[in-house]
A protein has these predicted regions:
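Conserved short loop/turn motifs at secondary-structure junctions
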Residues: 93-101, 258-261, 284-291, 323, ...
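Long, low-complexity segments enriched in small/aliphatic residues
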Residues: 327-335, 486-583
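A glycine-rich, hydrophobic/aromatic-adjacent loop/helix-cap motif
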Residues: 274-376, 477, 521-523, 532-536, ...
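N-terminal export/assembly segments and adjacent metallocofactor-ligating motifs
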Residues: 1-227, 235, 239-242, 254, ...
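Flexible glycine/proline-rich, aromatic-decorated loop/lid segments
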Residues: 192-195, 418-455
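Glycine/threonine-rich flexible loop motifs
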Residues: 165-174, 392-402, 441-444
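Long, contiguous, secondary-structure-rich segments that constitute the structural scaffold
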Residues: 460-514, 519, 574, 579-594, ...
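N-terminal leader/propeptide and maturation segments of large enzyme subunits in energy/redox metabolism
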Residues: 45-66, 227-263, 340-353, 358-362, ...
Length: 673
């Protein structure tokens, strides 16, 4: 409901993914767009104004001055041009955003590649499901889900591992609950107890970091008892014999001491899943945000393949994506190793195809640097300028003190956002952008559903849509782009992205959403893929045996507990939007962490008291809550609060394949504050 160019309330529409349902953020988290902190004019840092977390977003003119768009764009592009001329294109890198549209993500990666000649462009997928995508690309041949979450309606058994859908995917959680009400078996696996366990047949609260030992033990039982689907394996997979031989060493009786789950429970779960007519596997960042995140995902893929649970109704692999457009931004090429549609940057033929469409010369065949690697390169002096659109690494990156030091050292930082975020505190120029409610463009959700977004209100002040700002910068960088609207960008995307076959702008305007792949102009899209093979050599998916790898940093006498980080129901990622949403911030206004009641008692801290959390990277102080869902040797910390930033604590160690940091495990010392 819109009145006087303001959103008054929000109702769910009958879309293919939600059928009228909304999560708490969608229903109550909309008024941030009208917050007085909104950026409305371009800002340029005043001469000598120090960089750091020292700017009041309500009064940015202490450190910045207002500028015209002409001056700001000239300076933004000019600074990038100067760095390229002095040091080469590698001196400038970019972070895009999963909060932007597909068209904006596409233009952003194109600007970095075409304008600076390299692939050092990334976004927050590196911090959430990069390891999942690495495993899926390696073994299935596609980085998207094989079945929509709605397909749980056709399943007998479903596994949800490393995810807390009640808080982080509330709409999907309603389908999971419906599934159990009609008799479906729900298996929850998580080091934290979650609200979904009330609906579960089995709750496996395993030891943090022990995913591979637990999953391999389950698969060992399936092999040992002959419960695997031999016909499916022979027809659609490869490397089965190696997988089978590898699993021989993972008997549940050996693994129970490692993962903390009794052997009989592991055997029961194996029998339930293997015995299902159709089984689905859902996972979240509890699986992916480890140095062994790719191995965790390889295990889940292997479990689905050996039981024949891909490519049929009620079966499949579904990494629950964490942002409204992290799927779409990844599809659009906003990642350093792939061009749009996951086409590798290392192929001369593929780059040649894009060069032809773009009307430009070739660029580097090297895979680019990822989010954390880019900031490391800033520290080393190799990258001297950045263009950051809708991303907040000063809050979201691991070992965030290191990230902030990198941002402060940049010679030229352009930040494009809707608020003066923590990252914008380090900017030389700030460009005011339109929020999602204020722009046109498509987004692609976790279900592979491409959806049309339309503006409900106009942007405040002089704020502009992100795609239009990027096009203006490209012009000043000499790229000669000609786009009159997001529809023009979408038309270009279709020239190189087969996933968009049979999906047109006009069709999306008429139908609102189409799932890819769509096999004809009238096909609403395929909810299930790979029924007749996989987009790999000879149409076969691959088994990739995974070994047990310890977390990078394990508890010891100095740091005897484990800290894990994540989201809350009320707050979204770094909090820049939801902490400015009236209802959501009123419900959850204060930085907090969760510990087991016995742990608090041992610390001499009452629930609601303050604790100090310290790792090898830094310390924070925050309010402590009692939560029996948290293991006695664990503390859970949400990462939305700048006053007690969880990522001061986190470990920047990376998964070697997905290059994702280990947000879910670090050794910590907890004391009364």
């Amino acid at each position: 409901k819109i009145k006087d160019n303001k959103v008054k309330y929000v109702e769910g529409i009958n879309g293919p993914a939600n059928e009228g349902r909304l999560c708490v953020k969608g229903r109550f988290g909309f008024d941030y767009i009208h917050h007085p902190h909104r950026l409305t004019k371009p800002l340029i840092r005043k001469e000598g104004a120090p960089k750091g977390l020292n700017v009041d977003p309500a009064n940015p003119l202490t450190h910045f001055r207002e500028a015209s768009w002409e001056e700001a764009l000239d300076r933004a592009a000019g600074g990038m041009r100067d760095l390229k001329a002095a040091h080469g294109g590698q001196a400038v890198a970019g972070f895009g955003s999963a909060k932007c549209t597909n068209e904006e993500a596409y233009l952003f990666q194109k600007l970095i590649r075409q304008g600076f000649g390299h692939n050092n462009v990334d976004h927050c997928t590196r911090l959430c499901h990069a390891s999942s995508v690495a495993a899926l690309m390696e073994n299935v041949g596609s980085g998207a889900v094989t079945a929509t979450f709605n397909q749980i309606e056709n399943a007998d058994v479903a596994i949800v591992i490393g995810a807390n859908p009640t808080e982080n995917h509330p709409v999907a959680a309603t389908y999971f609950k419906q599934f159990t009400k009609r008799g479906g078996k729900l298996i929850i696996m998580d080091p934290r107890g979650t609200a979904m366990k009330r609906h579960a047949t089995h709750m496996l609260q395993f030891r943090p970091g022990a995913d591979v030992s637990m999953l391999n033990a389950i698969m060992h039982v399936i092999v040992e008892e002959g419960l695997y689907d031999q016909a499916y394996i022979e027809k659609f997979t490869e490397n089965w014999e190696a997988e089978k031989a590898h699993l021989a060493a993972f008997a549940p009786e050996k693994m129970e001491a490692i993962c903390g789950i009794p052997a009989e429970t592991l055997r029961a779960v194996a029998r339930d899943f293997a015995g299902a007519k159709a089984g689905m596997i859902f996972w979240g960042m509890g699986v992916s945000q480890h140095i062994h995140g790719t191995d965790n995902s390889r295990c889940l893929i292997a479990l689905a393949l050996m039981t024949g649970n891909v490519g049929k109704p009620g079966a499949g692999l579904h990494p629950l994506r964490g942002q409204n457009n992290v799927q779409g931004a990844s599809d659009a090429g906003l990642i350093p190793m792939f061009l749009p549609d996951y086409q590798t940057v290392t192929s001369d033929d593929i780059r040649g195809k894009f060069s032809s469409v773009w009307g430009s010369g070739d660029w580097s065949a090297e895979k680019g640097l990822t989010v954390t690697e880019i900031l490391d390169a800033v520290h080393h002096g190799d990258i001297k300028g950045m263009y950051i659109l809708g991303e907040n690494p000063a809050m979201s990156d691991p070992d965030v003190t290191h990230a902030r030091e990198a941002l402060a050292s940049l010679e030229h930082l352009v930040v494009q956002d809707i608020f003066l975020t923590e990252t914008a505190n380090y900017a030389d120029l700030i460009l005011p952008a339109a929020a999602f409610y204020e722009k046109s463009g498509t987004v692609t959700n976790t279900n592979r559903q491409v959806q049309m977004g339309r503006p409900a209100v106009t942007p405040p002040g002089e704020a502009r849509e992100d795609w239009a700002i990027t096009v203006e910068l490209a012009g000043r960088l000499g790229l000669g782009w000609r786009y009159a609207s997001p529809a023009d960008v979408f038309a270009e995307m279709k020239l190189t992205m087969k996933s968009l076959d049979n999906i047109t702008w006009e069709r999306l305007e008429a139908e609102n959403a189409v799932t890819y792949p769509s096999l004809s102009p009238s096909d609403p899209g395929q909810a299930i893929v790979f029924a007749d093979g996989f987009p790999r050599a000879e149409g076969r998916a691959r088994f990739a045996p995974a070994s047990v790898i310890s977390p990078d940093e394990t508890p010891d006498a100095d740091y005897p507990m484990v800290v894990t980080t994540g989201r809350q129901l009320e707050h979204w990622h770094t909090g820049s939007m939801t902490r400015r949403a009236t209802v959501l911030d009123a419900i959850e206004p204060e930085a907090n962490c969760s510990l087991h009641p016995d742990t608090l008692k041992d610390l001499g801290v009452a629930p609601g008291g303050m604790v100090r959390l310290e790792t090898r990277r830094g310390a924070i102080i925050m309010l402590a809550r009692a939560d029996r869902a948290v293991a006695r040797d664990m503390v859970f910390v949400p990462f939305a609060y700048v006053e007690a930033a969880a990522n001061v604590l986190t470990n920047p160690a990376l998964d070697p394949y997905g290059k994702i940091p280990e947000f879910k495990f670090a050794a910590v010392r907890v004391t009364a504050a």
